[in-house]
Amino acid sequence: MLAVHFGAGNIGRGFIGSLLSQSGYEVVFVDINDELVRLLKEKQEYRVIIADENRQELLIRNVSAVNSQTEREKVIDYITKAHLITTAVGPHILPAIATILAEGLQKRITINKTPLHIIACENMIGGSDVLKSHVFEKISEADKPLFEKYYGFLNCAVDRIVPNQKHDDPLSVVVEPFFEWVIEKRNIIGAIPPIQGAHFVDDLKPYIERKLFTVNTGHAIASYLGYYKKLQTIQEAMCDQEIRSDVEKALHESGAVLVKKYGWNENEHQSYIQKIIQRFINPSISDEVVRVARSPIRKLGANDRLIGPATQYYDLFGQVPHGLVKGIAALLLFDYENDEEAVALQKTIQETGVEGALYQYSQLEKDHPLVIAIKDQWQHLK
């Protein structure tokens, strides 16, 4: 079996590529990083180190790579032969890979009519739907029914902390022990693709929201409060009792939303929250506060990790979620000068105030009780 994976970065190698290799696939990575592509071609293997007290090492074999800029025809050829296509390139790169993917899929239809699944493993909601829409922009109306017939774009939720890192061997990658890869069955054509460790479900939305409103919410709040207290890593932040208490408070609020919406068992969800907290304090993973805090404007989105659970909490319970509000206020103070969004956010706040920023980025009306509470907390933290 052949899997073509777009994105040879740490998540691609340490999470998706690793699981695909362990599932029996030959994995061909597609990337534009010359050095990574050269090393993967040369060595055809790499190490994945599990970040726990045992430091277990997995040797991932039967891998190769191609450069999508200089070896375009090879990429297209691999797409025509693939049994599975996956991506881990970042949401903003999906439009860039759509052209070559569309080209490869068009050629494949003429020579190989075996159904094929494409899974965008990105930290976003509906990543494969987004990729499909970009691909469909590149093809003719006549080809669209054929693409619908033979190509299943499967949405998924992925969760594994893979921090920034440097090693003597550039291919080695350290990952946390925990991982979750949940794939929606809705667009499967024929047989379910064999992927060891993946979990196939009928409805992905509860899993996406559970991850977004727990892992991403907690991670974000730890990072912004950590930055506020001038701490360097998420682990340092979570060892600060005040920050840990604030994070737990916010996760109980977002958890109340999830339990109410999906009818989950409250005790089971509290256990999930504690599992997530333990991941954040894993001493074997050093995750920089400024990495986790990056792109604050995107994270202020109306349906994203902070505003999403906060507005839903207010709508469901008629109360202000003070843990989430404190996290949002800390985000509004994130002024890291090497982050373009942080710089732009501070400029917006200076020009239009906190109310203007929340209206522009979060679609919250200026007299909304959440806006009033966030501004009060922001002034208190300042």
From Swiss-Prot:
GO biological process: mannitol catabolic process
Enzyme Commission number, as recorded: 1.1.1.17
Alphabetically ordered keywords of this record: NAD, Oxidoreductase
Residues that bind NAD(+): 3-14
Cellular-component GO terms for this entry: cytosol
Any one Gene Ontology molecular-function term assigned to this protein's record: mannitol-1-phosphate 5-dehydrogenase activity
Record bears the keyword NAD: yes
Broadest EC class assigned to this enzyme: oxidoreductase
InterPro entries: 6-PGluconate_DH-like_C_sf, 6PGD_dom2, Mannitol_1_phos_5_DH, Mannitol_DH, Mannitol_DH_C, Mannitol_DH_CS, Mannitol_DH_N, NAD(P)-bd_dom_sf
Catalytic activity: D-mannitol 1-phosphate + NAD(+) = beta-D-fructose 6-phosphate + NADH + H(+)
Tree of life domain: Bacteria
Family in the record: Belongs to the mannitol dehydrogenase family.
Cited PANTHER family: ALTRONATE OXIDOREDUCTASE-RELATED (PTHR30524:SF0), MANNITOL-1-PHOSPHATE 5-DEHYDROGENASE (PTHR30524)
Entry-linked HAMAP family: Mannitol_dehydrog
Protein name, UniProt field: Mannitol-1-phosphate 5-dehydrogenase
Source organism of the structure: Geobacillus stearothermophilus
Upper classification of the organism: Bacteria, Bacillati, Bacillota, Bacilli, Bacillales
